[in-house]
Amino acid sequence: MIIFIIILALVLCFNVGVYAAYALAATEVSYTKKDGTTVSVKDALDELNKKVPTKSIGDEVTVGGEQFYVLEWDNNCDTVNLISKYNLNKAGTAQQDATYGTTGCAFSSKNYWGSSSNINLNDFIGCTETDAIGKAKSYGRSKGAISSRLLSYEEVDKLETKTNSISIYKMLYGRKPYGEGNYLRFWLGSASRIKNNVWIVAKDYGGIRPVEYYNESNFGVRPVITVLKSKIS
């Protein structure tokens, strides 16, 4: 019995030593930069994060040559959630600073969620590339986003309690209160409790309200994308 305990102790000590060696090696992983200097991976990540200044909700940033608003910011995360400054064009390939009629499209070609109500459709099986959610996802991929979707009803509900902030008001509705320019009208990724209806945002059209999914003249696609902070400028 004593011999067994001694052997077990030796095995445990060996394993701990191996683990410690691997852990130490991991902290010493490094690579050579273009200027010939060597830097550890940890230091490189720290340097990268320092280059991205802290942002607030409603701040404007640029990704891939197009403008976005900061929707969520967490200093402890390497990623950030952004919402496009404008609706996408009808093809869904780029943002377009235009009146709502120019960017309007149907939410989808059919009701693929049935009678389900008050649910988030962003990951609901059934949407196609030509649907509003499909366009948002495709656009996000073109920007190198980790994920992309439409804004949800719950997110808008929370943001509306913060619209005493001019920057958040402008981010959500597309213009300042009593300011010049057009309000944005856009689809949300949430089904309404009314059959065949999906939620939309349009400050000049009653705020947040349900609309038939096949309405193609008034409401556009406004993507929410999740990207690495290193991609913003």
Region annotations inferred by a language model:
Residues I2, C13-F14, T37, E129, ...:
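Generic alpha-helix initiation/capping and coil-helix boundary signal
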Residues K51-S233:
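Collagenous Gly-X-Y triple-helix signature in extracellular proteins
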